[in-house]
């Protein structure tokens, strides 16, 4: 019987695990059709190395294994260890936010791999930032199920209310695609919000290397720190307002420009101009 079976999951919860833990965002996927769609979107092939964060009962894990992937799974809940060990995977019972991604090599990880996961919703943003701050060259693709609201932020275009620093951060590293929405009824227990699957293809080359990359993200975080402010005011702690006005003018933006107006490319050009000697 498949691990996406509601009956099998309910029996496991009743006999072994107990109630799903809200503090770990435990909403277990029980829809086989959604699992197959995630697999198709992820482009996982036999022999691929795949990092799965928060495997839970192992429904998605099972699908990845059956595809022939080498799966490294990071699970925080020790109550799930024994059932996950029944699958042919590399399992770490650990806090994914604290796990050094360099340790993947200790599991036999070879070359560039993929991330495929139903991410715990309460730590989605820090996990996504960790993947690209700590090991941006480790991945070919990242396919994750996340809260629909976050998915729309990640895929937002300039000018919209959902567009922000997380959008800029991820689009710096990836080309991102909103794949499909997932209703609460596909989970046990049902979450109170809709979910969505997004697929990210990691760029071959990133616009900036360190230490400039860190400085660039400081600029974009400051820009969106107070969304209602004009961009020049939002950046006043980093750059004199007159310098920002001058740079905006060179990019054909007015002094009244707000943070959500600029694209990633615009922000990169602005950063370049503001980095020039005064």
From Swiss-Prot:
One of its GO terms (cellular component) is cytosol. Pfam families: RrnaAD (PF00398). InterPro entries: KsgA/Erm, rRNA_Ade_diMease-like_C, rRNA_Ade_Mease_Trfase_CS, rRNA_Ade_methylase_Trfase_N, rRNA_adenine_dimethylase, SAM-dependent_MTases_sf. It catalyses: adenosine(1518)/adenosine(1519) in 16S rRNA + 4 S-adenosyl-L-methionine = N(6)-dimethyladenosine(1518)/N(6)-dimethyladenosine(1519) in 16S rRNA + 4 S-adenosyl-L-homocysteine + 4 H(+). Keywords: Cytoplasm, Methyltransferase, RNA-binding, rRNA processing, S-adenosyl-L-methionine, Transferase. Gene3D superfamilies: Ribosomal RNA adenine dimethylase-like, domain 2, Vaccinia Virus protein VP39. S-adenosyl-L-methionine binds at residues 27, 29, 54, 75, 95, 118. CDD domains: AdoMet_MTases (cd02440). Its EC number is 2.1.1.182. It comes from the Bacteria. Disulfide bonds: none annotated. It is an enzyme of class 2 (transferase). GO terms for molecular function: 16S rRNA (adenine(1518)-N(6)/adenine(1519)-N(6))-dimethyltransferase activity; RNA binding. The keyword Transferase applies. Belongs to the class I-like SAM-binding methyltransferase superfamily. rRNA adenine N(6)-methyltransferase family. RsmA subfamily. Specifically dimethylates two adjacent adenosines (A1518 and A1519) in the loop of a conserved hairpin near the 3'-end of 16S rRNA in the 30S particle. May play a critical role in biogenesis of 30S subunits. This is Ribosomal RNA small subunit methyltransferase A. It comes from Chlamydia abortus (strain DSM 27085 / S26/3) (Chlamydophila abortus). The gene is rsmA.
């Amino acid at each position: 019987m498949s691990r996406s079976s509601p009956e099998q999951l309910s029996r496991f919860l009743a006999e072994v695990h107990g109630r799903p833990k809200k503090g770990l965002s435990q909403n277990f996927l029980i829809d086989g059709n959604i699992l197959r769609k995630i697999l198709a979107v992820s482009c996982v092939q036999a022999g691929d190395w795949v990092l799965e964060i928060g495997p839970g009962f192992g429904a998605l894990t099972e699908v990845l294994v059956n595809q022939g992937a080498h799966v490294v799974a990071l699970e925080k809940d020790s109550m799930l260890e024994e059932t996950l060990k029944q699958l042919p995977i590399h399992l770490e019972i650990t806090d994914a936010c604290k796990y050094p991604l360099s340790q993947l090599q200790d599991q036999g990880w070879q070359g560039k791999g993929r991330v495929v996961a139903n991410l715990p919703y309460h730590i989605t943003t820090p996990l996504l930032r960790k993947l690209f701050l700590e090991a941006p060259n480790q991945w070919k693709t990242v396919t994750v199920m996340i809260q629909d609201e976050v998915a729309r932020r990640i895929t937002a275009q300039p000018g919209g209310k959902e567009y922000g620093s997380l959008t800029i951060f991820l689009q710096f590293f990836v080309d991102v695609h909103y794949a499909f929405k997932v209703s609460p009824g596909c989970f046990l227990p049902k979450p109170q919000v809709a979910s969505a699957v997004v697929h990210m293809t990691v760029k071959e080359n990133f616009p900036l290397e360190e230490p400039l990359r860190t400085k660039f993200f400081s600029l974009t975080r400051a820009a969106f720190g107070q969304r209602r402010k004009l961009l020049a005011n939002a950046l006043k702690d980093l750059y004199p307002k007159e310098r920002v006005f001058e740079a905006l003018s060179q990019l054909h933006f007015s002094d009244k420009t707000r943070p959500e107006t600029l694209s990633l490319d615009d922000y990169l050009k602005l950063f370049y101009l503001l980095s020039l000697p005064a």
